[in-house]
C-alpha cells in the first residue's frame, strides 16, 4: 500500500486484474478514501490473497510469502510457470523487527529458483550503514521517557514503528494519534493473520 507501488494504478487499463494482500487492500483503501477517489474505486475490485496460500492466473502459479518491511502485509512471490521458478522479492528489509523471517522463508518455502528479481534501493549501501528498527525504537523510547511532550513523525502506514512505540510506552505516558491513524491501526490489529509480536 505504499504509493511507490500504487501511485500509477489508476493509469493502468481497468480490465487488467489487480491482486493485493487482504490487509494491504484494507489499508490502501483507507488511504485512498482520504486522498484519491479514483484510486479508491480501482481498489474496490482488487482480488485478494493471503500469505502462504498459492493462487493461479492462467497457467502461472503464484505463492505469496509475508516478509518484513515497513508496510505490514508485504510479500515476496514464488512464481512458477513452464517448469521454471522465479522469486520476486518485492520490498523487504533485514533490519526490521521481523528480520528473522527471511532465512526461514528461503530455507523452508523458497529453496532454489531459476530467476531472482529484486528491488535495488539499498544494494549499494554498506551493511554497517543502516540502523536497525529495534535501535530506532529504543531511541524513541528514551526520548519519550525523558521528555514531557514527544512528537513522532513517521508515515501513518509504518505500522511496525507505531505499534513498537505504543508497546514500549511508559505507563505514565499516553500515545495520541488522529482518527485517520487510529483507523489504520485498528484495521491492522483486527485483520492481521500472521505472526507478529506487535499486533
Predicted segment positions?
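Residues at alpha-helix termini
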Residues: 35, 171-172, 191
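Short hydrophobic beta-strand segments
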Residues: 149-154, 173-179
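Composition- and surface-driven signal marking solvent-exposed, interaction-prone regions
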Residues: 164-168, 179-180
Amino acid at each position: 500500500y505504499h504509493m511507490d507501488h500504487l501511485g500509477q494504478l489508476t493509469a493502468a487499463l481497468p480490465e487488467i486484474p489487480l491482486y493485493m494482500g487482504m490487509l494491504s487492500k484494507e489499508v490502501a483503501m483507507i488511504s485512498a478514501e482520504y486522498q484519491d477517489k479514483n484510486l479508491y474505486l480501482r481498489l474496490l475490485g482488487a482480488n485478494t490473497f493471503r500469505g502462504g496460500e498459492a493462487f493461479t492466473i492462467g497457467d502461472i502459479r503464484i505463492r505469496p510469502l509475508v516478509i518484513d518491511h515497513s508496510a505490514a502485509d508485504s510479500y515476496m512471490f514464488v512464481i512458477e510457470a513452464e517448469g521454471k521458478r522465479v522469486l520476486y522479492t518485492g520490498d523487504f528489509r533485514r533490519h526490521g523487527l521481523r528480520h528473522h523471517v527471511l532465512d526461514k522463508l528461503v530455507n523452508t518455502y523458497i529453496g532454489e529458483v531459476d530467476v531472482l528479481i529484486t528491488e535495488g534501493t539499498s544494494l549499494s549501501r554498506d551493511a554497517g550503514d543502516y540502523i536497525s528498527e529495534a535501535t530506532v525504537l529504543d531511541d524513541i523510547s528514551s526520548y519519550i521517557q525523558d521528555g514531557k511532550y514527544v512528537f513522532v513523525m513517521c508515515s501513518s502506514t509504518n505500522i511496525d514503528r507505531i505499534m513498537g512505540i505504543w508497546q514500549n510506552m511508559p505507563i505514565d505516558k499516553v500515545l495520541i494519534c488522529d482518527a485517520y491513524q487510529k483507523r489504520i491501526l485498528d484495521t491492522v490489529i483486527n485483520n492481521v493473520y500472521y505472526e507478529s509480536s506487535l499486533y
